[in-house]
Amino acid sequence: MQSATPGYELEDIDLLLTDANIATMDSAVEAPYGTIENAALAIKNGKIMWLGEQKNLPSFDVFATPTLSIKGQWLTPGLIDCHTHLVFAGSRAEEFEQRLQGVSYEQIAAQGGGITSTVKATRAADHEQLFVAAKDRLNTLLAEGVTTVEIKSGYGLDTANEIKILEVARLLDEHHPINIKTTFLGAHALPPEYKGRSDDYIDLVCNDMLDQVVANNLADAVDVFCENVGFSYTQTKRVFEAAKKHNLPVKCHAEQLSNQHGAELVAQFNGLSADHIEYLDEDGVKAMAQAGTVAVLLPGAFYFLRETQLPPIALLNQYKVPIAIASDFNPGTSPLCSLQLMMNMACTLFRLTPEQSLAGVTRNAAKALGLTDRGVLKVGARADIAHWQISHPAQLSYQFGVNKLLNLWIMGKLI
């Protein structure tokens, strides 16, 4: 928060927001949600240049400064979805119906279903088809106040198609208001042509795939699905070591279905996040706490798969591990496009508080992506700001199926 100083004047402001209640989510502000009531916020060149109680607002040119009254409603940071698989082709709706009719996942996979069907459809799609489908999904997130989204590859599973997915994600960043961060997830699943040769496939991921991804500047991070049905601890470590050589940060799909110690491994590499983590144990939590690795909860997948093993929320709180929440938007296990719904699910399914939930899609989601310029409202931060028609920030987690977004600014521009 910046207060007025004698002779200080706000000059050349692009926009001044007044009469606001602001949930800054800034841990330096002691109030719950980092709240500043009866506040104002000034934007210049896409960043916040002043924020504080309106009574302390410095003088400014009333006639030259565009001003908007928030009328006592609430401002929060723009929401951040830090884990998605948003670029893909095809649908798994028929498979969903089969599962509910009693057909096992193994039977579906034997028929060419499961992730194999998504890989086949994604390989067959061109850049434009993938772009159009993903843009529509991004528009849905944008309408709910989302300003930054992470997009993973992982449905190509060969060099050309993994590159294609990441190229589409970069194009989306150029042509969509939402800011996109990309993650290379070549080690998502074993492609059919490598059946029984998982080490050979990891060779491909660590060498040809990663080399081309880096050469074309297509990834901001590297991820691995470390699981019994994915890749082993040793294979995951190989990918992380390859990423480290290229100075790319790592993250991990860890402990979703069993404890493979992926969270401990990603912490050893000072990784950004361990995601899913239903089977995370205390040693893993300790390692994450020491490394500053974020715990990313994915309640949509938990719900859709009807899982029963809860993430160790009490341990995460005990060791003060930052908790983020994401949609995990994907066609197989979390076909949903609503970060607001995830906030409610994190509270109802995992017993997070509404304040933890909002932190999970703002401040901690930014940390999970290695971003320090967003996720909180403070002087110097990006002016990614959501304006809500709510009476209290807990309402964002309490209600679902009701979108209370009124206005959204990304880098200070009204969307």
Curated annotation (Swiss-Prot):
<feature type="binding site">
    <location>
        <position position="256"/>
    </location>
    <ligand>
        <name>4-imidazolone-5-propanoate</name>
    </ligand>
</feature>
<comment type="function">
    <text>Catalyzes the hydrolytic cleavage of the carbon-nitrogen bond in imidazolone-5-propanoate to yield N-formimidoyl-L-glutamate. It is the third step in the universal histidine degradation pathway.</text>
</comment>
<feature type="binding site">
    <location>
        <position position="85"/>
    </location>
    <ligand>
        <name>Fe(3+)</name>
    </ligand>
</feature>
<feature type="binding site">
    <location>
        <position position="92"/>
    </location>
    <ligand>
        <name>4-imidazolone-5-propanoate</name>
    </ligand>
</feature>
<keyword id="KW-0963">Cytoplasm</keyword>
<feature type="binding site">
    <location>
        <position position="333"/>
    </location>
    <ligand>
        <name>4-imidazolone-5-propanoate</name>
    </ligand>
</feature>
<protein>
    <recommendedName>
        <fullName>Imidazolonepropionase</fullName>
        <ecNumber>3.5.2.7</ecNumber>
    </recommendedName>
</protein>
<feature type="binding site">
    <location>
        <position position="332"/>
    </location>
    <ligand>
        <name>N-formimidoyl-L-glutamate</name>
    </ligand>
</feature>
<keyword id="KW-0479">Metal-binding</keyword>
<comment type="similarity">
    <text>Belongs to the metallo-dependent hydrolases superfamily. HutI family.</text>
</comment>
<feature type="binding site">
    <location>
        <position position="253"/>
    </location>
    <ligand>
        <name>Fe(3+)</name>
    </ligand>
</feature>
<feature type="binding site">
    <location>
        <position position="83"/>
    </location>
    <ligand>
        <name>Fe(3+)</name>
    </ligand>
</feature>
<dbReference type="GO" id="GO:0019556">
    <property type="term" value="P:L-histidine catabolic process to glutamate and formamide"/>
</dbReference>
<feature type="binding site">
    <location>
        <position position="330"/>
    </location>
    <ligand>
        <name>N-formimidoyl-L-glutamate</name>
    </ligand>
</feature>
<dbReference type="InterPro" id="IPR005920">
    <property type="entry name" value="HutI"/>
</dbReference>
<dbReference type="InterPro" id="IPR032466">
    <property type="entry name" value="Metal_Hydrolase"/>
</dbReference>
<dbReference type="InterPro" id="IPR011059">
    <property type="entry name" value="Metal-dep_hydrolase_composite"/>
</dbReference>
<dbReference type="GO" id="GO:0050480">
    <property type="term" value="F:imidazolonepropionase activity"/>
</dbReference>
<feature type="binding site">
    <location>
        <position position="155"/>
    </location>
    <ligand>
        <name>4-imidazolone-5-propanoate</name>
    </ligand>
</feature>
<keyword id="KW-0369">Histidine metabolism</keyword>
<feature type="binding site">
    <location>
        <position position="328"/>
    </location>
    <ligand>
        <name>Fe(3+)</name>
    </ligand>
</feature>
<keyword id="KW-0862">Zinc</keyword>
<keyword id="KW-0378">Hydrolase</keyword>
<dbReference type="GO" id="GO:0005737">
    <property type="term" value="C:cytoplasm"/>
</dbReference>
<feature type="binding site">
    <location>
        <position position="155"/>
    </location>
    <ligand>
        <name>N-formimidoyl-L-glutamate</name>
    </ligand>
</feature>
<keyword id="KW-0408">Iron</keyword>
<dbReference type="GO" id="GO:0008270">
    <property type="term" value="F:zinc ion binding"/>
</dbReference>
<dbReference type="GO" id="GO:0005506">
    <property type="term" value="F:iron ion binding"/>
</dbReference>
<feature type="binding site">
    <location>
        <position position="85"/>
    </location>
    <ligand>
        <name>Zn(2+)</name>
    </ligand>
</feature>
<comment type="pathway">
    <text>Amino-acid degradation; L-histidine degradation into L-glutamate; N-formimidoyl-L-glutamate from L-histidine: step 3/3.</text>
</comment>
<dbReference type="GO" id="GO:0019557">
    <property type="term" value="P:L-histidine catabolic process to glutamate and formate"/>
</dbReference>
<dbReference type="InterPro" id="IPR006680">
    <property type="entry name" value="Amidohydro-rel"/>
</dbReference>
<dbReference type="Pfam" id="PF01979">
    <property type="entry name" value="Amidohydro_1"/>
</dbReference>
<feature type="binding site">
    <location>
        <position position="188"/>
    </location>
    <ligand>
        <name>4-imidazolone-5-propanoate</name>
    </ligand>
</feature>
<feature type="binding site">
    <location>
        <position position="253"/>
    </location>
    <ligand>
        <name>Zn(2+)</name>
    </ligand>
</feature>
<feature type="binding site">
    <location>
        <position position="328"/>
    </location>
    <ligand>
        <name>Zn(2+)</name>
    </ligand>
</feature>
<feature type="binding site">
    <location>
        <position position="83"/>
    </location>
    <ligand>
        <name>Zn(2+)</name>
    </ligand>
</feature>
